[in-house]
Regions:
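Catalytic palm active-site di-aspartate
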Residues: 76
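Cleft-lining beta-strand/loop regions that shape enzyme active-site pockets
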Residues: 22-39, 46-48, 54-59, 63-69, ...
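Conserved catalytic motifs of ABC-family nucleotide-binding domains
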Residues: 73
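A post-motif C-terminal structural segment
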Residues: 294-302
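Extended catalytic-interface subdomain
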Residues: 301-311
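Conserved functional hotspot residues or short segments at active or partner-binding sites
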Residues: 1, 311-312
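Long, charge-dense accessory insertions within large macromolecular proteins
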Residues: 2-35
Length: 312
């Protein structure tokens, strides 16, 4: 029922704007997890074959591992939220099963597991914090003859706005740059290929690491009100040779960052002849009554709504 409702609303929003989407509550949580790099789950990776959704690996120290009841190749038959009626996940895609397993910190999820010998059992687990560090910025040093080149991969312009100590891509990029400077690299490559964008605030902060100070991007509302977002902090973290790698899937914040580096003549932008071409800004608008103290989870999810356009 929820899936049909979500599909119905998105069929309407897509007629008006390709970047406006309705998120059902579980999809809203998934979007927040992607942006923050943090979720609450059981510490297991899933896979799928003809037998259904299976356990591919168990993270040492995680809830599944600590239970001692879940092992690789166990098939997940049903998933229940606490004492609620279990959902039969036979025929589910792995991504849909994952959304049911994840939830709020400290809450209970019950998995009906089928063992390789055909026996079934219900395993009760308490969700714990999991960090998606593979989605964070990371760096490497490339040896080019007698010279060292620094390489930084940024998959998304992620930001955890719900937790003060949460992950921020601009802070992580600064840490990686400091590591590369300590290695005495001759230049740095920042790879935003396949980076679909993310936080507008973070891209301004990140561009400020490579310029002294100044405007980064202008945003404009439907009423025509313009606002310039600038790096207000004097000083440059890294002033050496810089290359930004893009491709046709580099969108939104990636395009803002590459454009700022180009406009300030701080580095070269290399890759495809054009990037994705997304020039709009979205915000999440919650639907329904809050389901938690912070209002992060709401009764009917949220709409990611286009509010503004951005300009170089």
């Amino acid at each position: 029922k929820e899936k049909r409702f979500e599909s119905f609303l998105n069929s309407i929003t897509s007629l008006m704007d390709p970047h406006t989407d309705y998120f059902a509550p579980v999809e809203k949580r998934s979007f927040t997890e992607q942006m923050s790099g943090t979720f609450y789950g059981i510490g297991a990776q899933l896979t799928q074959d003809d037998n259904g959704v299976k356990i591919a690996s168990v993270q040492p120290g995680g809830a599944a591992w600590k239970s001692g009841l879940i092992v690789v190749n166990d098939v997940i038959v049903k998933i229940a939220q606490g004492a609620e009626e279990p959902v039969d996940v036979t025929g589910y895609e792995t991504t849909d099963a994952v959304k049911l397993i994840r939830g709020d910190l400290g809450t209970e999820v019950r998995l009906t597991i089928r063992k390789p010998d055909g026996t079934t059992k219900v395993v009760v687990l308490i969700r714990e914090k999991i960090v998606l560090d593979e989605g964070f910025a990371r760096s490497a040093v490339i040896q080019n003859g007698n010279e060292k080149i620094g390489y930084i991969l940024l998959p998304d312009f992620y930001a955890d706005f719900e937790r003060e100590e949460g992950a921020r891509c601009s802070k992580d990029i600064a840490k990686e740059v400091e590591k590369l400077k300590a290695e005495k690299v001759k230049g740095i490559i920042i790879d935003v290929r396949y980076n679909g964008g993310g936080s507008l605030y973070e891209v301004v902060q990140m561009a400020g690491l490579f310029i002294d100070k100044g405007p980064i991007v202008q945003i404009r509302s439907k009423e025509g009100r313009a606002q310039t977002l600038s790096d207000e902090t004097p000083g440059i973290l890294y002033d050496g040779p810089l290359v930004v790698m893009v491709n046709e899937f580099s969108a939104s914040a990636s395009e803002i960052f590459a454009g700022a580096i180009q406009d300030y003549k701080r580095g070269l932008v290399v890759g495809s002849t054009s990037s994705y071409g997304k020039g709009t800004v979205q915000r999440n608008v919650a639907f329904g009554k809050p389901l938690d103290a912070m209002g992060i989870q709401t009764e009917y999810g949220a709409v990611k709504l286009t509010f503004q356009k951005f300009y170089r």
